[in-house]
């Protein structure tokens, strides 16, 4: 990719001057700057920046500056401002009070045809023109904050990523091709091929909640959920030495920003808008609600006016508080690894139209394992969790496979990061079980992930400024066992008759509940 830059620059003087008086000084400076100042730091044989033209006014010096990837016009302008101010101060007792860039243009030339759809939405840019293999970005009134925060550099990186790198993001990090099956149980006898959601609904084990992707789980389903959760905790979590923790499920946006989750999956979360704490402010909403007698555009519009901007999300990953626990801390290697788990509540993801049945919901429960350790041990912990999960699936006589994941949730969030961090060869594995009612084994649609096993490398260590006292590398990891989906997987393969269920489940249901609880029936439900 070839880059070219040009900028209109205005240097505001500290007082009005006679242009003829200072123009010789400016002319001399421009010549010297083009030969030396604007070439410093540029590799031999490459071009830096250049002041193409200038004009001296009574209170302003206007310049047209071009640049390359080695020295961009805004960087050149800041050099010019400092050095020219020093020279004008010595010779004419006038300084440079302000730097403005009314217009900044960036041209990106690619080696292939580029369309406007390839580029996509470009924040901050006032104009985007795409012709053949060229993308021309124009920015108006660039201020110092934009320069200080490297906003234009980030826009360039965003466009380059969108055109050249987006489809390669996972492949660049994952050394094994996503979708590769690394282990599997092999086929098992199919005992049930009915639709789990429809059968559970018919029996009254679940009832659909008004919210999309939400269900009420009645006693038979809840009992099965509890014993499966306890079985996983016993055979996997506690057996491997994970300690309990209670993590908040209302997560500040700042935390999601640090995780780079906002960069990667902003459309997959529920956002929380706290109300303005003023009861009188809500009086007109209550009156609107009373008069209209329903939730409509008018009543909801009145409510929206009383809400603050989004400040939180409902936990979409469940591991978020672990990184806040470690934030800005120094870790003692003698106390590693730190291994915690949380299974204290719901996890929320907005699936939108993809929410379907019990197998893909917006609200679900998991056992979330989190850990921090030195790299080799961090990966070993993941392997131990995977092996323990396989043993559980075997005890439950489930058909399963382990697949290299194609969607480590944090990777896309690194697209604007220039820092080089260490990552494992395979960031993420998915543990999937077969759902016979969804189709043949050869169809990816017939498999559902019941566990995700991730080693993040230094991603969160870097984002949350976690240090090891001797400066050694630390990795974090997380592994979520989706208990709600384990229930679906067991019912999909073994059916709804308890006598067909694996012995470990039956024993625990009898021990804990004295048998499978009954559905709380009414005169009209279940049908």
UniProtKB/Swiss-Prot annotation:
One of its GO terms (cellular component) is cytoplasm. Pathway: Aminoacyl-tRNA biosynthesis; selenocysteinyl-tRNA(Sec) biosynthesis; L-seryl-tRNA(Sec) from L-serine and tRNA(Sec): step 1/1. The keyword Nucleus does not apply. InterPro entries: aa-tRNA-synt_IIb (IPR002314), aa-tRNA-synth_II (IPR006195), aa-tRNA-synth_II/BPL/LPL (IPR045864), Ser-tRNA-ligase_2_arc (IPR004503), SerS_tRNA-bd (IPR041293). Gene3D superfamilies: 3.30.70.1920, Bira Bifunctional Protein, Domain 2. Keywords: Aminoacyl-tRNA synthetase, ATP-binding, Cytoplasm, Ligase, Metal-binding, Nucleotide-binding, Protein biosynthesis, Zinc. GO terms for biological process: selenocysteine biosynthetic process; seryl-tRNA aminoacylation. PROSITE patterns: AA_TRNA_LIGASE_II. Its EC number is 6.1.1.11. ATP binds at residues 349-351, 360-361, 485. It comes from the Archaea. It catalyses: tRNA(Ser) + L-serine + ATP = L-seryl-tRNA(Ser) + AMP + diphosphate + H(+); tRNA(Sec) + L-serine + ATP = L-seryl-tRNA(Sec) + AMP + diphosphate + H(+). Catalyzes the attachment of serine to tRNA(Ser). Is also able to aminoacylate tRNA(Sec) with serine, to form the misacylated tRNA L-seryl-tRNA(Sec), which will be further converted into selenocysteinyl-tRNA(Sec). HAMAP family: Ser_tRNA_synth_type2. Belongs to the class-II aminoacyl-tRNA synthetase family. Type-2 seryl-tRNA synthetase subfamily. Homodimer. This is Type-2 serine--tRNA ligase. It comes from Methanopyrus kandleri (strain AV19 / DSM 6324 / JCM 9639 / NBRC 100938). The gene is serS.
